[in-house]
Amino acid sequence: GVVQECRRRRYGTVIVPFPAAELTEALAQPLHRSGIALWVHEKCAHTAPGARVLVCTALSGGDIENRLSACCRAFGADRIVLDLQRLRMDFPLPCPTGEGIPLTDEQLAALQTGRQIFFSRELGARYFTYRRGGETRFVLLDDGDTLHRKIALGERLGIHRGLLTLPECADILRDLTG
């Protein structure tokens, strides 16, 4: 099973970054008894009371400080792990679903060339707009500075853990680790 495989490989943590309530509920007790940490998607926090809770910092609406503060109240800052997903999304305006199209490095570079880029304190991300086919588009993006700001905000709120993924953050690791 999972516990035996974690022991064999000397893993200290199991991360379930997607909503999977049945899975996290089934893993919670065996992992806890074995001294192996469990990190779960915030929608599954109720299924694993001793687990750390992954809270995504990539927002397309709302206010990051309000969101993280609400999560601290709901779960406790000591349980939270910032899921520092690197945002690179292209949205139509208006965008009632809040769902954008992920951009590759090459697509983002082509779109942002020659454009003025702004910082949104509320979203904790950079953005710019452009027009295509008579439609206004909105691009949200994270870089080393924006992720560093999100980490600093988390620290101010008492959140001392974060998760970065590779390869999406490989080019900005130096910006984040100093």
Annotated model-derived regions:
Residues 46-47, 75, 131-133, 155-156:
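Extracellular/periplasmic catalytic domains that process cell-envelope and extracellular macromolecules
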Residues 144, 165-167:
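Short, loop-centered acidic/histidine patches that primarily coordinate divalent metals
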Residues 1-19, 52, 149-165:
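Catalytic domains of carbohydrate-active enzymes, especially glycoside hydrolases
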